[in-house]
Amino acid sequence: MRHQKKKITLDRNKAARRSLMANLAESLIIYEKIKTTKAKAKALRPMVEKLITRAKTSDLHARRELMKVLYTDNVIKKMLEVIGPRYKDREGGYTRIIKIAGNRVGDGSEEAIIELVK
């Protein structure tokens, strides 16, 4: 029985879920606003918040911690040089989830926009 298990699985195994979250995080960092399902947005939010908090200190350890999750160099560079300093004085709440009215046509899933707070 899975009582009191809080992990959001998104109906994927661990490797597929990790890859999906990494790709969504990179897209959110590059475009600063993405449209996805509500469940994926809610799963992505804590991961991105922790990455931004890590990027606020732009030292070698922070770079290596970001490299564990994010794969492309330009995304890591943007995190350390642009996004980290932008939220230097903010303690948390770097992202916002906006629910979209109506459901997706193909499968009826609820959609949402997740964006970085300016």
Question: Where does each model-flagged region fall?
Answer:
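Structured, basic alpha/beta domains of bacterial-type, RNA-associated proteins
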Residues: 1-12, 19, 23-118
